[in-house]
Regions:
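Long, charge-dense accessory insertions within large macromolecular proteins
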Residues: 1-57
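Short, structured beta-strand/loop micro-motifs enriched in basic residues and often containing a Trp
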Residues: 56-65
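Short, Lys/Arg- and Gly-enriched loop/turn segments at beta-strand edges
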Residues: 64-66, 87-96
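A structural connector/turn signal
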Residues: 68-70
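Intrinsic disorder at enzyme termini
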Residues: 94-127
């Protein structure tokens, strides 16, 4: 998940996104995870990672589910998205190697806006 790892000298790992769609029958979804309500903290000056989330997309649109959804009926044509939390960063973001920040942007881990806000000593976020 882009921008989900906390900024730091050593950035936090990115969260993952999984989309679940029933194929030939309805089902019931239950979810559980940690750091869906509160962000994973950073250490020694590192920034927090992004919280995880559950979403449901159906005829009524897209809406966020509780952090531990229970007994959610999933009809055909409905999508459940699970985004796991990103990890918090370690150390001050200003200490991150500029080439590492550039690689993070090129690989799609961080958007230019995220880099501009969290790594202002680099100019890679201004492209």
């Amino acid at each position: 998940v882009e921008n989900s790892g906390g900024a730091g000298e050593f950035r936090g790992g990115m969260g993952l996104r999984r989309v679940l769609t029933p194929v030939d029958h309805e089902c019931v979804f239950n979810g559980a995870g940690e750091r869906f309500r509160y962000q994973p903290w950073g250490l020694f000056g590192g920034e927090a990672g992004a919280s995880g989330q559950f979403q449901i997309e159906d005829a009524d649109g897209i809406r966020r589910l509780d952090d531990k959804p229970n007994e959610v009926e999933v009809k055909l044509g409905t999508r459940i998205t699970v985004e796991t939390p990103g990890a918090g960063g370690y150390g001050k973001p200003a200490e991150r190697n500029a080439e590492a920040v550039k690689r993070d942007q090129e690989s799609g881990k961080y958007s230019p806006e995220f880099i501009k806000e969290n790594y202002p000593t680099t100019n890679f976020g201004e492209q």
